[in-house]
């Protein structure tokens, strides 16, 4: 007797008692007590208030004809071809010839948002409002990622449910995740897809060299980690509930079509949100300020805090990749590192910060006393404000920036070296095993050897006051934070030379030109950086 086929979704539901866990359960609204806290105004609720002035609506944006012509003129950088006529593989090959990684990042970003100009985008849209870029060119992003590559990755790589891939659905206002345990194999994944589930790959850069290359270049544009998710949605379905994110999102349509609705932040507290939201119901989000269909080759950008949802049209599947950045990269995040350090310095250097609190301050300060009218409260608050003003002068801003930079370098993808860079680096060194012995190991840098960093942002000097460390990205994993942050302590004799090398980028400089006191110190630094993959030579090294 022939057994009736059960879908992967049906099997999973039967094993879990017909219930599926929700990955993003709708959280109940937090109950906030409206009270004064030591003179600080109470927090606003995360819902629209009556009489609150609505945020200025975003409008569907398209570049003006003037911008379009300027964009076409300015973008004739890739061998005289406009971006809309250049395939991605050719673009990446041409970018490899650009000797400054920051220039590469600028040009790749310009390709991403073409024909909108970089300056106008950051002036008018970045962190402000969405923009839709329609191209009528289905092949514009061809080569970035595809369903064929998705299938290849499932067949050849160890893709784990819940770690690298999610199976999701959103029906009748309910968002569910259907991840079974273990490896995500094509047989099960495509069965989920046939059952109407969306498939999300959480870190395609770990499996796709092209995505890795694009993100590793763009992270130098943003000065913040660039990440990506890939979403494959069956026709006529929706995989996710309305929500907002804590990142700047670039939705790149790769295949098929998808209907998107974007909504203004619901209140001022959610503008440029620091955290992603729970799932919203349809009646919590208001009317969309953008209601569009993305075709292959189109791009949709929206800032963090903008609510959005996407559903697939009945006549086509949808494959898109969301490129993201600027997570926890605000002034406030820098201040979180700066203020504790400033207070520590102030307490060491200024006796006013070490003087004891008033003997009776508990009698008139604190929440239970916040409604009292007491002149002692006024004097207390005035003294606090005076100390806060003085605190600014103790703020170690550069040290706090370095703390942010250390986090960024840990977040970074390692650079994907060009053929020229690899040939001149430790990764292209001729050392190998053959004829039962190690061959061509004797490769030596010389004083006249010209070297430079592999990337402008590949390394950074940071000091903790007593020692100086060099933090670097070349040994990072393509999997986020799989490895600990990479650094090593710099010898005093090497610090000036390392700073010289960083500031010399993108020029090649000879080992002899490094400002160390001895030739031995110059060579030892160059050899250390070469072994760490941080530098490459102008001409490939040969065995002696």
Curated annotation (Swiss-Prot):
Region (Disordered): 1-78
Species annotation: Danio rerio
Catalysed reactions, as listed in the record: N(6),N(6)-dimethyl-L-lysyl(36)-[histone H3] + 2 2-oxoglutarate + 2 O2 = L-lysyl(36)-[histone H3] + 2 formaldehyde + 2 succinate + 2 CO2; N(6)-methyl-L-lysyl-[protein] + 2-oxoglutarate + O2 = L-lysyl-[protein] + formaldehyde + succinate + CO2; L-histidyl-[protein] + 2-oxoglutarate + O2 = (3S)-3-hydroxy-L-histidyl-[protein] + succinate + CO2
UniProt name for this protein: Ribosomal oxygenase 1
Record has Iron as a keyword: yes
Compositionally biased residues, Basic residues: 42-53
Gene name tied to this protein: riox1
Binding sites annotated in the UniProt record for Fe cation: 243, 245, 308
Keywords: Chromatin regulator, Dioxygenase, Iron, Metal-binding, Nucleus, Oxidoreductase, Repressor, Transcription, Transcription regulation
UniProt cofactor(s): Fe(2+)
Domain JmjC: 197-342
UniProt GO BP: negative regulation of DNA-templated transcription; negative regulation of osteoblast differentiation
Task performed by this protein: Oxygenase that can act as both a histone lysine demethylase and a ribosomal histidine hydroxylase. Specifically demethylates 'Lys-4' (H3K4me) and 'Lys-36' (H3K36me) of histone H3, thereby playing a central role in histone code. Preferentially demethylates trimethylated H3 'Lys-4' (H3K4me3) and monomethylated H3 'Lys-4' (H3K4me1) residues, while it has weaker activity for dimethylated H3 'Lys-36' (H3K36me2). Also catalyzes demethylation of non-histone proteins. Also catalyzes the hydroxylation of 60S ribosomal protein L8 on 'His-216', thereby playing a role in ribosome biogenesis.
Keyword Repressor: yes
Xref: PROSITE patterns: JMJC (PS51184)
Annotated compartments: Nucleus, Nucleolus; Nucleus, Nucleoplasm
Pfam families: JmjC_2, RIOX1_C_WH
């Amino acid at each position: 007797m022939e057994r009736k086929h059960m879908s992967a979704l049906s099997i999973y539901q039967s094993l879990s008692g017909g219930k599926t866990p929700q990955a993003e359960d709708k959280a109940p609204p937090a109950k906030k007590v409206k009270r004064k806290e030591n003179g600080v105004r109470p927090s606003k609720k995360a819902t629209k208030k009556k009489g609150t002035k609505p945020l200025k609506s975003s409008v569907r944006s398209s570049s003006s004809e003037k911008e379009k012509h300027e964009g076409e003129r300015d973008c004739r950088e890739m061998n005289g071809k406009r971006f809309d006529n250049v395939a991605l593989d050719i673009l990446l090959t041409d970018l490899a010839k650009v000797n400054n990684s920051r220039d590469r990042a600028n040009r790749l970003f310009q390709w991403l948002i073409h024909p909108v100009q970089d300056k106008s985008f950051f002036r008018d849209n970045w962190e402000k409002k969405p923009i839709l870029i329609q191209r009528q060119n289905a092949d514009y992003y061809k080569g970035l990622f595809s369903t064929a590559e998705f299938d290849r990755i499932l067949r050849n790589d160890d893709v784990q449910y819940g770690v690298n891939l999610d199976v999701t659905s959103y029906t009748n206002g309910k968002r569910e995740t259907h991840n079974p345990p273990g490896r995500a194999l094509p047989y099960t994944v495509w069965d989920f897809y046939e059952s109407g589930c969306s498939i999300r790959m959480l870190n395609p850069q770990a499996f796709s060299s092209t995505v890795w290359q694009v993100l590793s270049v763009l992270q130098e544009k943003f000065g913040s980690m660039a990440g990506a998710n890939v979403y494959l949605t069956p026709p006529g379905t929706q995989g996710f509930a309305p929500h907002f994110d804590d990142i700047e999102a670039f939705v790149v349509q790769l295949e098929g079509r998808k209907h998107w609705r974007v909504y203004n932040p619901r209140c001022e507290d959610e503008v440029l949100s620091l955290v992603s939201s729970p799932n919203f119901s349809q009646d919590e989000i208001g009317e969309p300020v953008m209601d569009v269909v993305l075709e292959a080759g189109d791009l949709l950008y929206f800032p963090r805090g903008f609510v959005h949802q996407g559903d697939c049209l009945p006549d086509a599947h949808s494959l898109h990749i969301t490129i993201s950045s600027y997570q926890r990269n605000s002034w406030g995040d820098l201040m979180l590192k700066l203020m504790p350090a400033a207070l520590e310095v102030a307490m060491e250097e200024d006796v006013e910060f070490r003087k004891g609190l008033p003997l009776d301050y508990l009698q008139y300060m604190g929440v239970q006393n916040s409604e009292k009218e007491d002149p002692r409260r006024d004097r207390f608050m005035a003294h606090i404000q005076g100390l806060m003003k003085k605190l600014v002068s103790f703020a170690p801003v550069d040290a706090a920036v370095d703390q942010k930079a250390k986090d960024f370098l840990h977040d970074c993808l390692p650079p994907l070296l060009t053929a020229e860079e690899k040939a001149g680096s430790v990764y292209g060194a001729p050392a190998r095993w053959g004829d039962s012995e190690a061959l061509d190991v004797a490769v030596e840098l010389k004083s006249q050897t010209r070297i430079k960093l592999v990337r402008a942002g590949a390394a950074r000097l940071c000091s903790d006051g007593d020692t100086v460390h060099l933090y670097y990205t070349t040994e990072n994993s393509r999997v986020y934070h799989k490895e600990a942050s990479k650094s090593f302590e710099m010898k005093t004799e090497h610090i000036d030379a390392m700073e010289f090398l960083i500031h010399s980028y993108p020029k090649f400089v000879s080992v002899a030109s490094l400002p160390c006191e001895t030739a031995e110190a110059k060579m030892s630094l160059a050899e250390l950086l070469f072994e760490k993959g941080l530098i490459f030579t102008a001409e490939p090294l040969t065995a002696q």
